[in-house]
Amino acid sequence: MTTGVRRRMGVDERRQQLIGVALDLFSRRSPEDVSIDEIAAAAGISRPLVYHYFPGKQSLYEAALRRAADELAARFLEPLEGPLGARLLRVMGRFFDFVDEHGPGFSALMRGGPAVGSSTANAMIDGVRQAAYEQIITHLGVAEPPARLELVVRSWVSLAESTALIWLDGRRIPRAELETQLVHDFAALAAVSAAYDQEMAGIVLRVLAQEPADGPFGELLARLSAFAPDVPAVPAQRLPRR
């Protein structure tokens, strides 16, 4: 009979294990509610050994949330193929997968809870927002985005973040509906901006020309057309004068 010998982990391997264990615990409870003792027990090591790999609780929490931030930013990566609406819908699916899997940790990352210093948390989430912004700009195929386009994309990224945080508080709206709604929100933000700027109008028209009727943007137009006849017209005296 052969007796198994427990392999000793290297320093980096052990650090990565502890980060993974911490993230798993953060998926169930807020980071500030998770103790080093719990992380040590889940990793199968002693509390002093945790401090051998991380100088303090703060450094372990920062490392764990940094990995979460990197993973969240990666959810916005998408091949540059197919209509934009379908691409954004896939991105939102992966984004909400992350939110669903790491609820308390996601909230802590976005809100900069006491487990992580505010400056560190802000730097992490700013990195996620910038990565998301750059990905969307790349999908739009605009080398030098005008100011209005930057405003649209950054506003939409913030909207996705806020929507996810609100959804986590009770999950009162079906997730799939929110994913689609956020894609529609992007189209709406872009369309409103296009109404004020010729360059934005050109970008929006180019995007819509590549969208199929059964895609997310086509669905939005169908929904708007469906209720348009029932909307009372604006009285002539209330229309803005040109």
Regions found by a protein language model. Name each.
Residues 1-2, 134-138, 169-242:
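C-terminal peripheral helix-coil segments that are non-catalytic and often amphipathic
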Residues 17, 25, 29-59, 63:
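Helix-turn-helix
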Residues 59-68, 109, 124, 128:
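Alpha-helical DNA-contacting segments of helix-turn-helix folds
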Residues 62-63, 73, 190:
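Short, Lys/Arg-enriched C-terminal cap helix and immediately downstream tail that follows
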Residues 63, 77-104, 142-146, 179:
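Hydrophobic alpha-helical connector segments
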Residues 98-123, 134-137, 161-169, 199:
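Amphipathic alpha-helical segments used for helix-helix packing
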Residues 117-146, 150-162, 176-191:
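Amphipathic alpha-helical packing segments from all-alpha helical-bundle domains
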